[in-house]
């Protein structure tokens, strides 16, 4: 009977540092990429989330997720003097949840359909949670939110459009497609470098359930 895929503390630390450094540097690079506008639609590179997604699908998902969130916080926010508190905490939590769930959903990294669905699913979860938090922040900040004419509709429309834009543009081009290409290519080749066995359906972590959530 094969054992579940487990990692030692040193291996988890290596995955954490690898995810933090690679994704942190990638977020610095995205700050330099200009956005362009077509009519009322603005296209911009939100993030290169494929980096932690690939690591989460091949290694320990929690280590990769926490590393990515920490890397973005340190490299993109604190080092650039953009740390604002609540917004960064929100991004830290949503990125961790999205990447972790995506990594747990993949049992066989060779299954391209599951890899693609998990990658875009992780992006959707992260973006949806961020959208909900942004809407709630406006509701709590504005007294009598429903009483202001047109405010609820404009907030929902703006946040909803931003959600779709980020998922369809950055989510597909810079998250799902690179992940779909890299995970099968790296599977079985990068794990031995950290002294780990490749993930299989028999050794993968158990599916997400109530016990895991608790």
What kind of feature is each model-predicted range?
Residues 35-37, 41-42, 109-214:
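Membrane-embedded alpha-helical hairpins and interfacial helices in multi-pass inner-membrane proteins
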Residues 63-71, 86-90, 113-117:
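Hydrophobic alpha-helical membrane segments of integral membrane proteins
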Residues 21-28, 70, 154-159:
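Short hydrophobic/aromatic-rich motifs at helix boundaries and adjacent loops
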Residues 46, 54, 65, 78-80, ...:
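Short alpha-helical interface elements
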């Amino acid at each position: 009977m094969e054992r579940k895929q487990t990692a030692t503390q040193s291996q988890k630390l290596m995955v954490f540092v690898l995810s933090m450094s690679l994704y942190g540097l990638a977020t610095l690079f995205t700050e330099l990429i200009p956005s362009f506008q077509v009519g009322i639609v603005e296209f911009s590179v939100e993030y290169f989330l494929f980096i932690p997604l690939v690591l989460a699908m091949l290694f320990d998902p929690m280590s990769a997720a926490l590393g990515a969130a920490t890397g973005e916080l340190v490299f993109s926010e604190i080092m650039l003097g953009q740390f604002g508190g609540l917004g960064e905490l929100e991004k830290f939590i949503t990125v961790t949840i999205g990447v972790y769930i995506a990594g747990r959903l993949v049992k066989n990294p060779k299954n391209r359909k599951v890899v693609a669905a998990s990658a875009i699913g992780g992006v959707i979860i992260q973006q949806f949670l961020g959208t909900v938090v942004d809407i709630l922040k406006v509701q709590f900040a504005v007294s009598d939110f429903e009483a202001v004419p047109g405010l609820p509709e404009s907030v929902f429309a703006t946040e909803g459009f931003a959600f779709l834009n980020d998922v369809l543009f950055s989510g597909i081009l810079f998250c799902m497609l690179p992940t779909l290409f890299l995970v099968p290519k790296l599977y079985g080749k990068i794990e031995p470098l950290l002294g780990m066995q490749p993930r299989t359906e028999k050794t993968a972590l158990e599916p997400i359930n109530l016990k895991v959530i608790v």
